[in-house]
Amino acid sequence: MIVTIINKVRKMAKGFLPFYLFTLLPLLSSCSDYSDYNTVPSAGDQPSANKTLWENISSDQQLTKFTALANKCNFAAVLQSPRFFTVWAPVDNAVSDAEYNRLMASDSATILKQFMQQHMTEYNYPVSSALDSMTIVSLNAKHHPFTSASFDGFSYNAVNIPSTNGVMHKISGLSEFHNNLYENIDDLSGCDSIKNYIQKYDEYYLDVNASVIGPLRDGKQTYLDSVMKKRNNVIRTIMRADLEDEDSTFCMFIPNDKAWNGAYAAISPCYNYIPKLDYMDLSLKTSVASSTKATDAKAAKAAEADGELQDSLTRRNIVSNLVFSNCYQRNWPLFGKGSFAANDTAYTTSRNSLTDLQEMMNHTIATNEMSNGMTRTIDSLDYRSWQTYNPVIATAYPEKALKVTKLTSHSIPLDSLKGRDSLFAHVPKMFMQWLKPATSRFFQYVAVDSANIDGTTGKPEFNFALRNVRSTTYHIYVVTVPAQVEEPLADVKPYYLRFYLSWTDAANKQQYTVLPQGAKSTIEMTTDEGESTATMTYIGNPGCVNVFDLGEFTFPVCYYGLDAYPSLMMMHTKSYTSSSNRKKYDQQMRVAGVYLVPKDYNDIWANNE
């Protein structure tokens, strides 16, 4: 059904019911379903029982400030209406002159939200000795503890003052208003970069449930009063946090402009796109790696990148890991409960695990309480790049295999590898987190078998598509697996491998490189310790899981989010027409993964080991 808004739409910047709605309330009768809430305890002969809330408040000499503020925001009509409310009214000496003057100098919407609605709720909430602690949701959707002794921690001056349309309790303090984390974005100072970025994606929508429905006109729904609320796609889809939810508790890092600019400068180079990007389409590739040219199997259509993509992804990566929920105990140090130890992990609302949060906390220059959590304003946002905007790129299954009779996937139970540590003797510690992860019960790899046929000249080959590569420097590794992982008594033979990389330069010219760069085709080497000469051919340690180090490589353009990708070709360099070759070298290829490790992450592991 088409919705027509026939009255002037009033946009609500904070998403709460506008006070104008209450002016319609005299037209509405109290709901009989809530009669239990609309009856105050017997008032006896109390004269206030025959007066409205407004009449009782405006005539009370202890509530002159409350009265003046209600008049300033035109709220008297609401307190005079038949709709039933409970009011917790701060007495005059509970409201400091400074706060009173600030409110009186504010606009009506501010007074309404920060004072009137802060101290009121619908229905009847009397004070009695039987009252246990409960939470009151005030008209501005804030939460307040309510007991027989206090409201929001402030004791009572008087309780259960009856009126024809509600009940009033006078309290000795002013319930302090706090923005929620979403509302706080609009009030940020010195943090214009994050403020402007988030506000850019604010959108307003009609809250049908809160609006006053009108008649149908020409088959179209109309509204007597329309309530507009605000939501934000950055917060909902990138941060994945309900920052307006008063029932949740979050800690949010707020980078000031210095921190934002520093993070932008660090992240942006990883997303260096070119308008059109040609690349090798592995589905079209037919020649073996050793005979392939740079422009072979060129994709029919170049991948295209929008001119704003680099800026958009940079900003997205800045904000995506700023919010943490109190639901996870590992996050509690952010809320002042304990402290982070070295390598402790915190968990963001965007479902990312971060370490070294203490370093970010050390750059806190201000903390502020919010109605649903707290903020930490920071002057440096130094993410660990590999945990956020520049992760390790890993792939285990080839996009294409050439000269292959059979390609199979293998999952070996980790329990079967217990006591066989010699298999992994040459594997750096960095790789054990991926090869034998705590979240899996299996060691996995893929294998090809094409060389077991006597007389074949085929050289089996894996072609890996390296998707989502950033424009940065990686250390490239390939992990191979020996037959002994699955067959302990198999013949112990080394591999004999070469590697080729297809990539595109910043001028959109396709390139084809032997790895490692600068390799000498006339030299062969093993992975024995002490050998460091760059060579074209790799011969692994026989009978072991090998991590072949193909060296550093800098990709000049970014492929993230595009159809395009660079490709890694891995092939046997020996044919098997010779029985001596079949006896000397492994006739299968088994690969547990190709890893592109960002240089800064690789350097940390190299230094530690």
Task: Walk through the language-model features, giving the residues of each.
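Mature, structured domains of secreted/extracytosolic soluble proteins
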Residues: 31-609
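Bacterial Sec-dependent N-terminal signal peptides
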Residues: 1-53
